[in-house]
């Protein structure tokens, strides 16, 4: 039986096919981030960021590339700076004790937590420096590159940055991406199926999440052949 990962617009198709796959010995998961009853398996894209400093930046940049492709040359300046900002804020979240490692938290921190974003982030960098546990050079450099822009330019960068992450301000999506109940790296090695359910009315809102899910699924399963 083939492993699958597929999007489904309506639940009855899951009900029909998932039972058959379970009977054939597969583990079956339903990722339904907009479910009204919040019954969903969870998928956290940040769980695939390595803890190794040598690999961490590349993993973050791979997510940033999926979020901010910048296919239009006219938008390249904004998308490249949005990726740089994503790199910096993601490192900030990962390196700050006690913060959830989620895309929702990245959006919250990049929104300033009630302060202008520059004041909030630079203030946190200074606090850590003064306390003797500074953020990594990669984090500080990425944030400084973006936050040193003029106010108008910074506003444009942040607007581009926010566009890709606004769906994660939805509490249901934030919860559904707060941890992982399945491992995309296991799709080629284990007998498993992942159904990604999105209601037709949410397809536009979920576009970024769908793209990121399948981008990670492809990249993580083509790094090496399954054993």
Question: Which positions does each model-derived feature cover?
Answer:
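P-loop NTPase motor domains
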Residues: 1-227
